[in-house]
UniProtKB/Swiss-Prot annotation:
Domain of life: Bacteria
Cofactor note: Binds 1 Fe(3+) cation per subunit.
Coiled-coil spans in chain: none
Gene it is expressed from: bimC
Descriptive protein name: Inactive autotransporter heptosyltransferase BimC
Induction of the gene: Induced upon infection of host cells (at protein level).
Family that this chain belongs to: Belongs to the glycosyltransferase 9 family.
Length: 423
C-alpha cells in the first residue's frame, strides 16, 4: 500500500485564499446548493493547498499532507519526523502529492530543482489556524474526544477551531474561550493550515484516518492516536450558565435506553427491583434519557415511578441534573459520557463492550462469566447499524446474555461502594 499518492494534472494556479485569512472572523453559511458538508459533519478541504511556498509551490495539511507543484522538474521528499520514516521520494513534474495518511503526522517536505534545495517545510502549527472536525452522530464520544483536541492545541500552541453539532458547542464553549467553535456548515476550509477529522472509520484497514482502532484502545482514546497526543483520558471542562441544584432532596439519574438492544439491561424485573431499592433508601429517580412510550422493555417499569426529562431537554439542562445527582445508573451511550464529563459517578451496566471501550470508572458493572465484549472482537463482525445485533448468539437462548446476566445484587453492591451514597 503506497503511503503517498501523486496526481499529474495540476490545477491552474491563481488567486486563492491566502493563509492570512482569519478563520475566527464571523462567517455566513454557504448556500445550500454549494454546501459540501458530509452527512457525518465533515467539511471537505479546499480544492487547492492553502499555504504558499517558494517557487510557486503550495502546501497544507488539510487532507493529510498536500503539495501542489507548478510546471517544472522536481524532486519531492516527504518524511515522518516522529518515526524518521521516508514516505515519498520521487522526481515528478506538475501535479499534486497527497499523503494517504490523513491523521496527524509531523511531515517534513523537501523539494529540489536543478540540483539545489528550493523548498523545505517542517510541520509547525504554532500560531496557525487548525481545524478539528467532530463526527456529527457521536455526541457522547465527542465529549471523550474533545480532551485530546485540547491537548493538541496546548502541545502545538495553534489557533484551534472545532467543528461540531450545536448541542455540543453550547456545552463546551463557556469553558474554552480560547477555542473557536463552529457548526459544520460554517466551516471555511480555505483558512486552515491543518485539518483533522475525529470519528469512527469502519473499514479503514489502511489506517488512513485512525492509526489505532477504537475496539483496541477505546472509543475516545482513538482520537489521541489520530492527533498524536498523550492517550490518557481527560474529561472536558463543563461550565453551565445555570448550575443550581434542580431538586432539593437526593436523587439518582437513570439512562436505560439505547438504540442498540445489546446495550440494554434486559434482566427480567431488574429495573423495578432497583427502583424499589433506591426509593427505600430515600432517593428520587430521574430518567435523564427521556424514555419513549413507544419502546417497551424492562426499563418501561420506571415510567410510572420516575420523573422523566422532556424529550427536547437541552444537553446543558441534562448536564445540570447529572452534575448534582448522587450517581447515574446507565448503559453505554451518550448520557453516560455526559455524566462522566460533568463529574458524576457513573454506574455503567455493560457487557457487549470491554471496559477499555469507554471512560474509566470504578463503578462499571460487568459479568465476566457471561459472553461479553463482542464489540471489541473483530471476528464477531459486530454491526453498529443493526439495532438488534447479537453477533455470537443471535436466535438462541444466550442472545444478549452479556447484560442480562448482570444481577441486581451486583449493581446494588456497586452503588453502595460510591462515597456518600446512603443505601
Amino acid at each position: 500500500m503506497p503511503k503517498v499518492t501523486f496526481s499529474g494534472s495540476a490545477p491552474t494556479l491563481g488567486v486563492h485564499a491566502p493563509p492570512a485569512l482569519d478563520p475566527r472572523q464571523p462567517a455566513s453559511p454557504p448556500p445550500a446548493a454549494s454546501n459540501g458538508t458530509h452527512a457525518r459533519g465533515f467539511s471537505p478541504p479546499a480544492d487547492m493547498p492553502t499555504w504558499s511556498g517558494t517557487e510557486g509551490v503550495r502546501f497544507d495539511f488539510n487532507d493529510g499532507c498536500r503539495v501542489l507543484l507548478p510546471d517544472g522538474d522536481w524532486t519531492v521528499r516527504l518524511r515522518d519526523m516522529h518515526t524518521d520514516t521516508p514516505l515519498f521520494d520521487a522526481q515528478i513534474g506538475a501535479g499534486v502529492v497527497t499523503s494517504t495518511r490523513k491523521h496527524f503526522v509531523p511531515f517534513l517536505i523537501e523539494i529540489d530543482a536543478g540540483g539545489r534545495r528550493v523548498f523545505k517545510h517542517l510541520f509547525d502549527a504554532h500560531g496557525k489556524p487548525v481545524l478539528i472536525q467532530f463526527e456529527a452522530q457521536r455526541l457522547g464520544e465527542a465529549l471523550g474526544w474533545f480532551g485530546y483536541a485540547v491537548k493538541f492545541q496546548r502541545q502545538h500552541r495553534c489557533k484551534l477551531t472545532c467543528s461540531m453539532p450545536a448541542p455540543l458547542i453550547a456545552l463546551l464553549r463557556p469553558g474554552y474561550p480560547d477555542i473557536e467553535f463552529v457548526t459544520p456548515e460554517l466551516v471555511k476550509p480555505e483558512c486552515y493550515y491543518a485539518t483533522y477529522r475525529l470519528g469512527r472509520f469502519a473499514g479503514d484497514e489502511a489506517h488512513a484516518y485512525q492509526p489505532s482502532a477504537p475496539q483496541l484502545v477505546g472509543a475516545h482514546r482513538s482520537a489521541a492516536y489520530m492527533l498524536g497526543v498523550d492517550p490518557r483520558e481527560a474529561p472536558p471542562r463543563i461550565e453551565l450558565t445555570d448550575d443550581s441544584r434542580p431538586l432539593a432532596g437526593p436523587y439518582v439519574c437513570i439512562a436505560a435506553q439505547s438504540a442498540l438492544r445489546c446495550a440494554r439491561w434486559e434482566r427480567p424485573g431488574g429495573w423495578r427491583e432497583l427502583q424499589r431499592f433506591l426509593t427505600a433508601a430515600g432517593y428520587r429517580i430521574v430518567c435523564v434519557d427521556s424514555p419513549s412510550p413507544d419502546v417497551a422493555d424492562e426499563s418501561s417499569a420506571l415510567a410510572d415511578v420516575a420523573y422523566s426529562l422532556a424529550p427536547d431537554t437541552p444537553w446543558t439542562e441534562r448536564a445540570r441534573w447529572l452534575r448534582h445527582a448522587a450517581c447515574l445508573i446507565g448503559v453505554p451511550g451518550d448520557l453516560s459520557w455526559l455524566a462522566w464529563a460533568v463529574g458524576a459517578p457513573v454506574v455503567l451496566i455493560s457487557g457487549f463492550t470491554h471496559p477499555v471501550s469507554e471512560f474509566d470508572t470504578p463503578y462499571r458493572v460487568i459479568n465476566s462469566h457471561a459472553c461479553n465484549s463482542c464489540w471489541n472482537d473483530a471476528s464477531a463482525n459486530f454491526d453498529d447499524a443493526d439495532a438488534s445485533s447479537c453477533p455470537r448468539h443471535a436466535g438462541t437462548l444466550r442472545q444478549f446474555e452479556c447484560a442480562r446476566l448482570v444481577s441486581v445484587e451486583q449493581i446494588k453492591r456497586t452503588i453502595r461502594s460510591i462515597p456518600g451514597i446512603a443505601c
